[in-house]
UniProtKB/Swiss-Prot annotation:
Its main location: nucleus. It comes from Caenorhabditis elegans. SMART domains: H15 (SM00526). The modification N-acetylserine is found at residue 2. The lineage of its organism: Eukaryota, Metazoa, Ecdysozoa, Nematoda, Chromadorea. Residues 37-113 form the H15 domain. This is Histone H1.3. The keyword Nucleus applies.
Length: 208
């Protein structure tokens, strides 16, 4: 009986599993982006259209061939084709490209002409200069009007001042006449006193 009990206990006891040590967490280092060996797709598309010089515009296939020959785009043609389709659609929306024939990416494309935009700019500048010229004479006229008004007021004040002086001038003339009449008898009496004093000095001299 003891043997059977020991055997059953040995069967029931589960074997202990040894835990493996946890691996240290490795921090993911972000991969450095490789520098792109080609310019942006919109620049390559415009260069392809200008290089092909087709009157009706260039097709997507022709543009793709030009890009793969002249630029280091890679060998994944499916991705290149998808990127090219997106850039063509975005170029039409942003008006950088004009779709001359067809719809979507299956048509023909041309670069928008910049001459029309350059021709419109001088017209706006001329209009602005015309407005400036119109504003300057108005300001000058207003300034001249103010100057004339100031001159007229100044002349009026001068005339009134002259009138006041003319009214006051006769009073000044009357004063000197009265002073001359008062001083004239005093001057005549002075020489008589001097004549009377001279003979007195001559009489004192012989006594010494």
């Amino acid at each position: 009986m003891s043997d059977t009990v020991v055997a059953s206990a040995a069967v029931q006891a589960p074997a202990k599993t040894v835990k493996s040590p946890k691996a240290a967490k490795t921090t993911k280092v972000p991969k450095a982006k490789k520098p792109v060996a080609h310019p942006p797709y919109i620049n390559m598309v415009t260069a392809a259209i200008n290089g092909l010089k087709e009157r009706k515009g260039s097709s997507k296939i022709a543009i793709l061939k030009y890009i793969t020959k002249n630029y280091n785009v890679g060998d994944q043609i499916i991705k290149i084709n998808a990127r090219l389709r997106d850039t063509l659609n975005k170029g039409v929306v942003s008006k950088a490209l004009v779709q001359s024939v067809g719809t979507g990416a299956s048509g023909r494309f041309r670069v928008t002409e910049k001459k029309a935009a350059a021709a419109k700019k001088p017209v706006a500048k001329k209009a602005a200069t015309g407005e400036k010229k119109a504003k300057k004479p108005v300001a000058q006229k207003a300034a001249t009007g103010e100057k004339k008004a100031k001159k007229t007021t100044a002349t009026k004040t001068k005339k009134t001042a002259d009138k006041v002086k003319k009214v006051k001038s006769p009073k000044k003339i009357a004063k000197p006449t009265a002073k001359k009449v008062a001083k004239s008898p005093a001057k005549k009496s002075a020489p008589k006193k001097a004549a009377a004093a001279k003979p007195a000095k001559k009489a004192v001299a012989p006594k010494t």
